[in-house]
């Protein structure tokens, strides 16, 4: 095979539908749009969710809940993610972002107790779960709420 013999795979290039080019083409006259009506017109059709005048599903279902604009959103990290740090490191939210353990700090960092920690670390964060505090202190580390 040579470079000039390269060809697209069978069915990879599909010809566009040429509509409205005579009845013999099979797509003449109404161009596959059926008879008259809203859908046959240029720009015609109904909006998404419209059910022909019947009360639409999104209005038949009850409203539920709300978004509390004052809620604090914490970046959650499990203990096993902190094993990437050396012994004696002071782990701060800035260091976590720098080491790509967390993408964004948001309103602070919350340390959760899933997994085990083998290193002796000083961890500074906005919140800690009870199990996280126990495990960090059992490993000989310190917990500081900032």
UniProtKB/Swiss-Prot annotation:
GO molecular-function term, one example from the UniProt record: rRNA binding
Keywords: Ribonucleoprotein, Ribosomal protein, RNA-binding, rRNA-binding
Coiled coil: none
Regions of compositional bias (Gly residues) in chain numbering: 21-35, 42-52
GO cellular component labels: cytosolic large ribosomal subunit
Pfam families according to UniProt: Ribosomal_L27A
One GO process term, biological-process aspect: translation
Record region (Disordered): 1-56
PROSITE patterns: RIBOSOMAL_L15
Summary of subunit composition and partner proteins: Part of the 50S ribosomal subunit.
Function of the molecule: Binds to the 23S rRNA.
The family this protein is said to belong to: Belongs to the universal ribosomal protein uL15 family.
Protein name: Large ribosomal subunit protein uL15
Organism of origin: Clostridium botulinum (strain Loch Maree / Type A3)
Species classification: Bacteria, Bacillati, Bacillota, Clostridia, Eubacteriales
Gene: rplO
């Amino acid at each position: 095979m040579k470079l000039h013999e390269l060809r697209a795979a069978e069915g990879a290039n599909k010809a566009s539908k040429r509509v409205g080019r005579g009845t013999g083409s099979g797509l003449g006259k109404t161009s596959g749009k059926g008879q008259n009506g809203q859908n046959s017109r240029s720009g015609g059709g109904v909006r998404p969710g419209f059910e022909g005048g019947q009360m639409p599903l999104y209005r038949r279902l009850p409203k539920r809940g709300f978004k509390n604009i004052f809620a604090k959103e914490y970046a959650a990290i499990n203990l096993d993610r902190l094993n990437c740090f050396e012994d004696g490191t002071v782990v701060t939210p800035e260091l976590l972002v720098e080491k790509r353990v967390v993408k964004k700090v948001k309103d602070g960092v919350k340390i959760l107790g899933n997994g085990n920690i083998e290193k002796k670390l000083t961890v500074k964060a906005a919140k800690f779960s009870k199990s996280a505090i126990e495990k960090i202190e059992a490993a000989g580390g310190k917990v500081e709420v900032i």
